[in-house]
Amino acid sequence: MSAETANPVNQARSTIYQLLSSLFAKEVDHKTLHELTSTQAQAFWSQLAEEPNFKADVDVLVAELAKLNSDKALLELAADYCGLFLVGTNNSASPYASLYLTDTPVAKGDEPLLFGEQHQQMTQFLKQSQLQVQSEFPEPADHLAVILAYVAHIAMYTSNQQQLEFIRDNLTNWLATFVAKVAKVDTGKFYIALAQLTLAWVNSDLEWLTSESTS
């Protein structure tokens, strides 16, 4: 690992990407809730909220997490997750890059193709880094959670320029469209806030990487 990548800033960046990835990867369960509401997590949320662009969405996430004080509340949030990200309908916001980047128009009633070009590209990126999608996560490699987890990895092990190019070519070119879809169809507050925070974070990180790469 180079001196450029092995520093506290990149470790912190990697942690944030990994957190965002984990929340898109699966429903919030009791274990995750405990981790997200621990004393250490509260300090993390407070620090993240110091950035004006993040504060509103962080405040919503913290408030919504505080409401998850029963099995029923967790089940309701899990239902929101399922309806948004696991069911491919007009009222969902499928978290796959290929659905937002495909050049082929999808006819009404047709199912967009998964495991397509973006999936193949991400699979190749993972192989190059000697990584793979975990077997218990049976999703295409262009799932947002996989892409965010990969950025968490390269934040630790590659140059700022390489990170900049990957984020620009594989994340920011579709993330805003996905977030707009979440905002349109989500009836709750948690996943809208999560999506908007993710977009704000990625855009902020891209600006930082750009300034670091040109300085």
Curated annotation (Swiss-Prot):
Record carries keyword Cytoplasm: yes
Main location: cytoplasm
Subcellular location: Cytoplasm
Pfam families for this protein: Nitrate_red_del
InterPro entries: Chaperone_TorD (IPR023069), DMSO/NO3_reduct_chaperone (IPR020945), HscB_C_sf (IPR036386), TorD-like_sf (IPR036411), TorD/DmsD_chaperones (IPR050289)
GO cellular component, one term: cytoplasm
GO biological process: protein complex oligomerization; protein folding
Record keyword Cytoplasm present: yes
Record keywords, A-Z: Chaperone, Cytoplasm
Record's function text: Involved in the biogenesis of TorA. Acts on TorA before the insertion of the molybdenum cofactor and, as a result, probably favors a conformation of the apoenzyme that is competent for acquiring the cofactor.
Entry's family note: Belongs to the TorD/DmsD family. TorD subfamily.
Name this protein carries in UniProt: Chaperone protein TorD
